[in-house]
């Protein structure tokens, strides 16, 4: 399929992938891209984020909303610098323990940046796999079924590529209304 040309797609840098995923929470892709580009121009490394003052970071975030995302990322960047010697942890549980890092963000960053075979399940992926599997309701049990289906696909394949492909199909083909996946 045709994948979108996204500025953070051509990197394995866990910092750039992580900040892009944080920006994309509750924010549309077309809105987030200019913020991402400005952010990377101002803060090219995780260390540059960690040492920056909160007001400078919040000023750059202005217009994206959901400021807790930004503050959590800032807090997490300081923890990574102090506790992990500036290296973003490639262990799922350790990365998940950082402020603001949920299941999806951990799955996306670890699979794309480090090749860790862990699912990255967003709303698009849930919708896609639900439709393919005939799942009608996203109960806790059904979410676990979806997670296990994806885990079973992550063998002998680049997990980052698979996760991104599933997200793209969900975002561009298996859309909520008038989907092209039936």
Language model feature labels by segment:
Residues 1-180:
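Catalytic cores of DNA base-excision repair glycosylases
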